Structure formats: structure tokens, C-alpha cells
Amino acid sequence: VLKGPCTTPISEGFRSINVELRRQLDLYANIRPAKTIPGLKGRYENIDLIVIRENTEGLYCGEEIWLNDEKTAAKSMALVTTKASERIVRHAFKYALSNKRKKITLVHKANILKYTGGLFLNTGRRIAKEYDGKIEFWDMIIDNMCMQLVLNPHKFDVIVATNLFGDILSD
């Protein structure tokens, strides 16, 4: 056990201890399984998917500032690097291969976030070419992914995403 349960104040106070631990210890891959439990009735049966979330960058990197003294405007900075994107996408492919998974879906918002989302998407597409014929690769805009995950969860196997999107999808 790394630490006991703790909370982070909402909207003010100290920064998340989890975010700092991830950064200090370079805990870059957050692997979250989502699986139906046999015998437990639910909307779907036989769901078995994995969300792999990049855990050190994105909007959760903690780069926020107030834009004025009145604290009526704030700005957050999303950090996405080629190094971290390559590392998490390669991790997803290695995970998929070693666990006999068939498909990876990379989640992004590159249609709007041209630089950060585009960098993550293009890195994923480049790395996917190295695994062509071994693992099926798809990419999906986060908006559509949320809808598809609710309507058709059986279509997904391994999902790889930036920090914020992976957090939202896996919760």
C-alpha cells in the first residue's frame, strides 16, 4: 500500500496528493478494468474491457493560474508530450499483446484540441503501424466514445486515453 485514503478539497485548498505521487514516482499508466460479474444482472453481459490512462500529463498536470486578482477568471494548461504519448500507447499495445486482446481504441479530441489532441492521436497512429496485423487499431473522438461506451460496450477491448478522458471513461 502506497498511502491510505485521503481526499482533495473541491475547488480550493491543496492540490491532489494523487497527482503529486504520480508525478514524483512516474506512475504513468493507470490500468482500469471494467468487467461484468457473472450472475449479477445488468444492462449488458460479458463485458470485459480495459481503460489505460496516461497518468502524468494532460489537464491534470496541475498547471493552473488565476488571470486576475478578483479570481473571476482562471486558466488551466494541458501538457501532452511525444515522450509520454509514445510511452502510454506502447504500453497499451504491449498490454494488449501479452493479454491476448484484439483491439485498441485511442480516445482523443483532436478535432478541437489540434495541438495536444493532435499530438496524442498522431503518435498513436504512428505506433499502431508497428503493430499492423497484430492488433486492430481504432481512434475515436471522446464525445462519440462516451456514447458508444454506453450503447455498445462490447465493441471495445483496450481503450487508451489521455489523463482526463481516461479518468472520465473509467469512472
Model-derived regions: residue spans:
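Generic structural signal for well-ordered, non-membrane alpha-helical segments
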Residues: 10, 14, 18, 81-89, ...
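Flexible, glycine-rich phosphate/dinucleotide-binding loops
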Residues: 58, 113, 146
